[in-house]
Amino acid sequence: MIAYLSGGMENAKDSGSQWRNKIKLWLKENLDHDVIDPVEIQKKTLTKYEIKNYRNWINKKPQKFNNIIHKIIDRDLSLIKNNADYIICLWDESVILGGGTHGELTMAYYFSKPVYLVLNLPINKTSSWILGCSTKTFTNFEDLKIDLLQQHESK
């Protein structure tokens, strides 16, 4: 099984790598599941120069900016459609100003991929659309882990 780790990057501390690294290790050790980590994939898809500068190109070099963003969007959505079995998403303040996580969850829902949403915001501050795309919601990663263990213990 392969989990896609969705959540804020653009506005998140360390691009959201801390929680992804923790759940990645847990999934491998406890379920022998692999992950698609967009933080790691981005390092392979874009050059260090592109990663460092693409946001500065919004106004200065809009076509160059669009080319980079299209590369990111195409890659992420293709991985969700063609490679991921399910999605784990941390929904926190870092996703509010972004758009990628919203699109990823919508795409996963459209292609009938289970979406496990870990809320780090009050549920009444969470988009109805996002809740509708979710298979299950959790208020912490420990409850998610218990659920995943129960789902996969007989497999």
Label every model-predicted segment.
Residues 1-155:
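Conserved catalytic or regulatory cores that recognize and/or transform ribose-phosphate-containing ligands
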